[in-house]
Each structure stands twice: as structure tokens, then as C-alpha cells.
Amino acid sequence: MNFPDSSLFTPNFAYENDLDFSSLITPSTRVSFQEPKPCNPVIHSAGIENDGRQNCETTMTLSEIMKGDDEPKNKRAKHKELERQRRQENTSLFKILRYLLPSQYIKGKRSSADHVLEAVNYIKDLQKKIKEVSEKRDRIKRSITHPSSRGEFSIRSLASSTCSCVGDTNIAVVVRPCLIGLEIVVSCCNRHESCLSSVLQLLAQEQCFNIVSCISTRLHQGFIHTIASEVEEGIEVYFSELQEKIIKIGTSRVTTR
């Protein structure tokens, strides 16, 4: 079988050069993919106008987003910490308050509100006691600085009854109540110089007297001793019996010389 000559199928390159195939070639669209870095991921958002053109591109890092979310959490954490510290301080202060209050004020009361109320009552009671003690102190000062006419009369009568005789051993004693408890006035001659110490020893032995003041006055014929003493609560003092004891001990001291 005879084939035609291959030269018959040779393309005419000169004619081919006149043809334009560029319109038949469709350019390939390449989409570039860039994997974001894990350490700093990026979120892209594009705003599109009405004409379809891209308006702007906003870039926000994930760390900024997380920071904005953490701000309320940080505020809540700070608030909780401050509240915890405040509660601890209040608890410690209430413990100190319970320690300072006497037991009779907080007996049977456990709530903090009751403790605060009893603390107010305790302060009022202390103020009342301070006022009473101050008034009592002022009365004692006035009685010592400005003695009453009755006291002056008693002292004068005792002084007049004091003998000037060398051999006389009598002692005049007056026991009477006063503002603070008991007042003892002893008048004696010059021979009874140790009378005051004897009376003080006697009062100390009784164990129910608390001596507050002692004033000794020297006269021409002897001495006048004025003793102010407190008496313990619940103890009854018999003035006549105490007067006899003082006279007896004063007389015995002079006799034994």
C-alpha cells in the first residue's frame, strides 16, 4: 500500500505565525494560601461598599481580644480579694472586742451585733462609774479643805476636854460616819505621841478598813488625829465598840511605859 508523501502534511509555519491564539488561552487564577502563625494569629475582615469595591481592612490580634475579655475577670478577682481581706479584718476586730468585754456582758450572746451593743453598754457603765468616783473625790476634797461647822465644833470640844495634867492618861475619841465610810477623831495629850500609830495598827488588824487619809494637828496641850477610812461592803461597824477599843489601846500604851 502506497502512502502519500509526508511533505504534504507539513504545516505552513508562515501562515501559523499570522494566527493569534492569545484569546483562546484562559489565565489561571492562583489563590495563595498563607498559614497563619500560631503565636500571633490574624483575623481579617473586609468592609465592602455598595459598588463592590473593598473599603478597608481591619486587623485585630487575638491577644488584644483576649485582653479585652480578661479585664472584667480581673476586676472581679480584685473585688473578691478586697472583700476577703475586709472580712478577715472584721473577724480579727470582733475577736479583740470579745476579749476586752467582761464575761457578764457577752454571756449567752454569740452574734456580732449583740457584742457591739454590749460594748456600747459597757462604755456607758464605765462613764457612769467614772462620774460617780469623780464626784466622790470632789466631796472628799471639799470636806478636807473646808471642814463643816459640826467638825470644827467636835474638834474644839475634844481639844477643850484634853487635859494638861502630866499624870492624866485619858483619851477622847469620836467615831462617826462620813461620805467615804468612817471618820475617827482622836484627841490626846502630849504623853500620847504614839497614839496615832496604835490606832492605825488597830484598824489594820480589823481587816475591814481601808485608810484613805490621816491628818494630825499639834495643839498646845496635845494632838488631834483625824482618820478617814473606807469600810468593806457588807460589814457592819459598831461605833461604840470601836471607840472603846481605841481608848483601851491608847491607854495601855501609856500605862506600859
Swiss-Prot record:
Induction info: By salicylic acid (SA).
Molecular function terms from GO: DNA binding; DNA-binding transcription factor activity; protein dimerization activity
CC annotations in GO: nucleus
Tissues and organs where the protein is expressed, per its UniProt entry: Expressed in roots, leaves, stems, and flowers.
UniProt keyword Ubl conjugation, yes or no: no
PROSITE patterns listed in its UniProt record: BHLH
Major localization listed first in the record, in broad terms: nucleus
InterPro entries to which the protein is assigned, alphabetical: bHLH_dom, HLH_DNA-bd_sf, MASH1/Ascl1a-like
Identification of the protein by name: Transcription factor bHLH55
Organism from which the protein derives: Arabidopsis thaliana (Mouse-ear cress)
